[in-house]
From Swiss-Prot:
Keywords: Cytoplasm, Magnesium, Metal-binding, Nucleotidyltransferase, RNA-binding, Transferase. The gene is pnp. Its EC number is 2.7.7.8. This is Polyribonucleotide nucleotidyltransferase. Residues 689-711 are annotated as: Disordered. GO terms for molecular function: 3'-5'-RNA exonuclease activity; magnesium ion binding; polyribonucleotide nucleotidyltransferase activity; RNA binding. It comes from Shigella boydii serotype 18 (strain CDC 3083-94 / BS512). It catalyses: RNA(n+1) + phosphate = RNA(n) + a ribonucleoside 5'-diphosphate.
Length: 711
C-alpha cells in the first residue's frame, strides 16, 4: 500500500507541502514539494559504490519543466519537450551551487538529482520550490550530505524586504535575490537589483537566511519520520607517510613556482614539478596510485597559496590583497559594429559588441510562466583559445549561459526604457583571454560598448570578483581574483554596479562560518575596486555618444488614428508589405496607432512617413484632387486619388454631356481632376470629373505630410 508521509508549513505568504513515500519508490529518495499550486517532483539516486579510478565528484542536477504543468501542449514540431531551455539550465545551476559543497571531501560516488515541474501557479516561480525539494530529497536519501539547506527569494518593495514575492510583486520590486544556506551559514546568493546600497544588499541576504530556517526545521522533522539510514561511508584513510614524502619532494619547488606571475609560464613549471615528483615516487614504489599522488600534490598547491595569503605575503602575481590588475580600456575597436570595446584586466580580456535592432528583433520566450518578449539580449562566448587550449566549438555550455546571465544582470538596471529608446539591443562578449572573472570583464566591456553605440544607459557599470581565504578566525578578502585564487579559495564573490549602487551580486561559498562581518568587509572592498575601475573606464568614454552609429537603423516614430491601422496594413498585409519593399524600411504598428519606421537612410524613412501620411489622410468632401485612372468599366472609371484610396467616377459624372463610351473620354493612367462628392459609411468614395472642371479653383494634390510642410 502507498503510505505517503506529509509535512505542511507556512512559509511567508505561501503554504509549503513536503510529501514522500508515494511516488518513485525505487529512487534513493523522492519528494513532491508544492507551494500554492506550484509543485516540483524531485528525485535523488546515488550509487553505493564509486567507479574505480574516479577522481572527481560526479554530481548531476537536471531541472525540467513540463508544459502540462501550465495546462499547455508544447509548440514545437514534435509537440514534446526538447533539450533544456536557457531558463531550465540556469535553475539547474541554481540548485547545484549550494548543494555541491555539502558533500564530504573524498566522496566520489555518482549522484543525480532530477527536478520535474509538474504543476505551476503563474504567481509562484518553481525555482525556490525545486531547491527546497532537492534539499529534502538529499536529506532523506541517507547519502552523505551535510544539509539540509533552505532557499528563499527576497524582494525589496517600499523600503521593505519581502519574502518569496509573487510574480506581480516582483514587477514592483527593486530587488530579485535568491539566497540558500544551511542552518548556520549562507552558501549561495544570486541577485539583480536596481542599484541598491551595500547595506541594503547585505540586509536582504541576512533576511533571506533568517526566514529560510523554517524550511530547514521542517525538512529535519520529515527526515526523522521518513529518512533512510545514513550510508556507512568513510573517506579513505590519510597516508601520512606518503603525504610527508610528497611534500618533501615538491612543496618548496611549488612554492617557488607560485611566485611566477605569468600564468602560462607558471602552469608549465607546476606541470613539470608534478610530473617529476610522480615519476620519482613511482620509481621508488610501483604500487602507488598516480591519481592519489595527483590529489596530494593539489592539496600542497592549495596550502602553499593559502598560507602565503594568510601570512600577508604578496599574492601569486605579486599584488597586495586589495590591488587590481593593470587595466586597458579601448572603445570603437571594430569599424562596422554599432558599438564595440576591448576591456583588458591583467590576463583577462573581453571583446564586447553592442548591436541595435528593431522591436521585430526581440526574442519571444515561450516560458512555463507565460510568453514574454526580451528586448535586451546578452550572449557570452568562452572559446578554448582564451585559456590556451584546444577544444570543441559549438552551442553554449551551461557555464557560458550562467556567466552570460550574470553579466546581463549587471547591466540590466541601467538600460533605458523602451519608450525612450525603442531598440532591441544585443550585447555579445567574446572572451579572448581568461585568468579570473571573465563575467565581470564582460560587464565592464558591455557598459563601454553600449556607450560607444550611443545607447543612453543611466550610468556606467563595472564588475569585480572577490575571493576569500579563511583559516579559523584569520581571514583575508582578495580583490580581483585570478583563476587559481578562485579554485583554491573559500568564496567566489562577484559584484557589479555603478557609482550609485549594486546591480548584481553573486556569491558561492565553499565553507561554513562566513559571517555577516566578513561579507560586509568583502562588499566594501568590492565597492572600492568597482569605483577604481569606473574611474579608468570614464577616461576612455565618460558618457553615451550623442548619436547612434551610422550603420545602425534609425527609428522614427509617428502617430496615426487607430481606425486607420487597417488601411496601412491592407488586406492580408498587402499594403504594409508593398510599403516596406517600396521604401526599403522596416515598419511596425502598435494597437494605439504608434508607427515605428526603422531605416539606415534618413531619406528612405522620410519617404515611408510621407506614404503613410498619404494613406491615412482624411478625404474631404467637396475638395478637388488630381487623380489617376486605374480601371475603366462600362458604367464609369475608378480613379486613385493618393494614399492608396480609390473612388468611382460614374459615367454620368465624366462630362457635361451624355457619354456613350467611357474610353472616348478617359484612358488608363490618365491624370484627371476629380471632386469628392461623397464618402459613404463603408468608406466608398464617389467622384466627379464634370464638377471638378466646372470649378474655377486649381486642382489640389493630396495633403502633403507634416514632415514636408515643416521643411
Amino acid at each position: 500500500m502507498l503510505n505517503p508521509i506529509v509535512r505542511k508549513f507556512q512559509y511567508g505568504q505561501h503554504t509549503v507541502t513536503l510529501e514522500t513515500g508515494m511516488m518513485a519508490r525505487q529512487a534513493t529518495a523522492a519528494v513532491m514539494v508544492s507551494m500554492d499550486d506550484t509543485a516540483v517532483f524531485v528525485t535523488v539516486v546515488g550509487q553505493k559504490k564509486a567507479k574505480p579510478g574516479q577522481d572527481f565528484f560526479p554530481l548531476t542536477v537536471n531541472y525540467q519543466e513540463r508544459t502540462y504543468a501550465a495546462g499547455r501542449i508544447p509548440g514545437s514540431f514534435f509537440r514534446r519537450e526538447g533539450r533544456p531551455s536557457e531558463g531550465e539550465t540556469l535553475i539547474a545551476r541554481l540548485i547545484d551551487r549550494p548543494i555541491r559543497p555539502l558533500f564530504p571531501e573524498g566522496f566520489v560516488n555518482e549522484v543525480q538529482v532530477i527536478a520535474t515541474v509538474v504543476s505551476v501557479n503563474p504567481q509562484v516561480n518553481p525555482d525556490i520550490v525545486a531547491m527546497i525539494g532537492a534539499s529534502a530529497a538529499l536529506s532523506l536519501s541517507g547519502i552523505p550530505f551535510n544539509g539540509p539547506i533552505g532557499a528563499a527569494r527576497v524582494g525589496y518593495i517600499n523600503d521593505q524586504y519581502v519574502l518569496n514575492p509573487t510574480q506581480d510583486e516582483l514587477k514592483e520590486s527593486k530587488l530579485d535575490l535568491v539566497v540558500a544556506g544551511t542552518e548556520a551559514a549562507v552558501l549561495m546568493v544570486e541577485s539583480e537589483a536596481e542599484l541598491l546600497s551595500e547595506d541594503q544588499m547585505l540586509g536582504a541576504v541576512v533576511f533571506g537566511h533568517e526566514q529560510q530556517q523554517v524550511v530547514i526545521q521542517n525538512i529535519n522533522e520529515l527526515v526523522k519520520e521518513a529518512g533512510k539510514p545514513r550510508w556507512d561511508w568513510q573517506p579513505e584513510p590519510v597516508n601520512e607517510a606518503l603525504n610527508a614524502r610528497v611534500a618533501a619532494l615538491a612543496e618548496a619547488r611549488l612554492s617557488d613556482a607560485y611566485r611566477i606571475t605569468d600564468k602560462q609560464e607558471r602552469y608549465a613549471q607546476v606541470d613539470v614539478i608534478k610530473s617529476e615528483t610522480i615519476a620519482t615516487l613511482l620509481a621508488e614504489d610501483e604500487t602507488l596510485d598516480e591519481n592519489e599522488l595527483g590529489e596530494i600534490l593539489h592539496a600542497i598547491e592549495k596550502n602553499v597559496v593559502r598560507s602565503r595569503v594568510l601570512a600577508g605575503e604578496p599574492r601569486i602575481d605579486g599584488r597586495e590583497k586589495d590591488m587590481i590588475r593593470g587595466l586597458d580600456v579601448r572603445t570603437g575597436v571594430l569599424p562596422r559594429t554599432h558599438g564595440s570595446a576591448l576591456f583588458t584586466r591583467g590576463e583577462t580580456q573581453a571583446l564586447v559588441t553592442a548591436t541595435l535592432g528593431t522591436a521585430r528583433d526581440a526574442q519571444v520566450l515561450d516560458e512555463l510562466m507565460g510568453e514574454r518578449t526580451d528586448t535586451f539580449l546578452f550572449h557570452y562566448n568562452f572559446p578554448p583559445y582564451s585559456v590556451g587550449e584546444t577544444g570543441m566549438v559549438g552551442s553554449p555550455k551551461r557555464r557560458e549561459i550562467g556567466h552570460g546571465r550574470l553579466a546581463k544582470r549587471g547591466v540590466l538596471a541601467v538600460m533605458p526604457d523602451m519608450d525612450k529608446f525603442p531598440y532591441t539591443v544585443r550585447v555579445v562578449s567574446e572572451i579572448t583571454e581568461s585568468n579570473g572573472s571573465s563575467s565581470m570583464a564582460s560587464v565592464c566591456g558591455a557598459s563601454l560598448a553600449l556607450m560607444d553605440a550611443g545607447v543612453p544607459i543611466k550610468a556606467a557599470v563595472a564588475g569585480i570578483a572577490m575571493g576569500l581565504v579563511k583559516e579559523g578566525d584569520n581571514y583575508v578578502v582578495l580583490s580581483d581574483i585570478l583563476g587559481d585564487e578562485d579554485h583554491l579559495g573559500d568564496m567566489d564573490f562577484k559584484v557589479a554596479g555603478s557609482r550609485e549602487g549594486i546591480s548584481a551580486l553573486q556569491m558561492d561559498i565553499k565553507i561554513e562560518g562566513i559571517t555577516k562581518e566578513i561579507m560586509q568587509v568583502a562588499l566594501n572592498q568590492a565597492k572600492g575596486a568597482r569605483l577604481h575601475i569606473l574611474g579608468v573606464m570614464e577616461q576612455a568614454i565618460n558618457a553615451p555618444r550623442g548619436d547612434i552609429s551610422e550603420f545602425a537603423p534609425r527609428i522614427h516614430t509617428i502617430k496615426i488614428n487607430p481606425d486607420k491601422i487597417k488601411d496601412v496594413i491592407g488586406k492580408g498585409g498587402s499594403v504594409i508589405r508593398a510599403l516596406t519593399d517600396e521604401t526599403g524600411t522596416t515598419i511596425e504598428i502598435e494597437d494605439d496607432g504608434t508607427v515605428k519606421i526603422a531605416a539606415t537612410d534618413g531619406e528612405k524613412a522620410k519617404h515611408a512617413i510621407r506614404r503613410i501620411e498619404e494613406i491615412t489622410a482624411e478625404i474631404e468632401v467637396g475638395r478637388v484632387y488630381t487623380g489617376k485612372v486605374t480601371r475603366i468599366v462600362d458604367f464609369g472609371a475608378f480613379v486613385a486619388i493618393g494614399g492608396g484610396k480609390e473612388g468611382l467616377v460614374h459615367i454620368s459624372q465624366i462630362a457635361d454631356k451624355r457619354v456613350e463610351k467611357v474610353t472616348d473620354y478617359l484612358q488608363m493612367g490618365q491624370e484627371v481632376p476629380v471632386k469628392v462628392l461623397e464618402v459613404d459609411r463603408q468608406g466608398r468614395i464617389r467622384l466627379s470629373i464634370k464638377e471638378a472642371t466646372e470649378q474655377s479653383q486649381p486642382a489640389a494634390a493630396p495633403e502633403a505630410p507634416a514632415a514636408e510642410q515643416g521643411e
